[in-house]
């Protein structure tokens, strides 16, 4: 489920896009999926909580983070990115676990998450603003709904069940 989102995000923003933009779209997609479906929220929160699962997430994501953010942190080692992944995964888990409300809307959640995580990786402010603007102009709910439907169809085929409306 997690790996497929990078593929979907890549198709959305284009093959040769800025990797930081791809990271932003992918993480916003995860947060939006959790917000739109309580079952997915539970799955994500559990994945970010169960020790065996989160360790796998940390290891795989740290490799991706190093590829994406090494231009901003050229002196950082693989272990530095692993340690940073532990922290940014905590951002993700916390934001997934907390449903939006009238004060903390999805738009504010996405903007705050990106501001915090991109700052950790020392992405320049101007680039952060351009990425936030791009995300704000996406219909992230519609995109997440399409991804969710694709996910459910895949699950139906793999596990031979049917979801009813």
What is the predicted function of each stretch?
Residues 25, 46-100, 104-118:
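Amphipathic alpha-helical packing segments from all-alpha helical-bundle domains
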Residues 41-46, 126-130:
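Short, hydrophobic secondary-structure boundary micro-motifs
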Residues 17, 74-81, 125-131:
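Short, surface-exposed acidic
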Residues 1-6:
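Short, basic, alpha-helical segments at the C-terminal edge of helix-turn-helix-like DNA-binding modules
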Residues 9, 34-37, 92, 99, ...:
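Generic structural signal for hydrophobic core residues of well-folded globular domains
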Residues 7-40, 46-50, 56-63:
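Hydrophobic alpha-helical connector segments
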Residues 67, 71, 101-165:
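C-terminal peripheral helix-coil segments that are non-catalytic and often amphipathic
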Residues 9-13, 41, 95-103:
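Secondary-structure edge/capping motif, primarily at the C-terminal ends of alpha-helices
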């Amino acid at each position: 489920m997690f790996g497929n989102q990078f593929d979907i995000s890549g198709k959305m923003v284009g093959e040769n896009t800025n990797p930081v933009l791809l990271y932003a779209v992918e993480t916003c997609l995860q947060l939006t999926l959790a917000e739109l479906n309580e079952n997915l929220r539970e799955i994500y929160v559990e994945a970010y909580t169960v020790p065996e699962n989160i360790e796998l997430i940390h290891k795989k994501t740290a490799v991706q983070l190093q590829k994406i953010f090494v231009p901003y942190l050229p002196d950082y080692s693989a272990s530095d990115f692993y340690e940073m992944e532990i922290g940014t995964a905590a951002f993700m888990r916390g934001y997934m676990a907390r449903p939006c409300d009238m004060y903390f809307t999805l738009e504010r959640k996405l903007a705050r998450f990106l501001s915090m995580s991109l700052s950790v990786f020392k992405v320049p402010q101007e680039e952060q603003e351009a990425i936030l603007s791009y995300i704000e102009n996406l219909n992230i709910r519609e995109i997440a709904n399409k991804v969710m439907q694709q996910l459910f169809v895949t699950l139906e085929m793999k596990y031979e069940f049917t979801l009813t409306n």
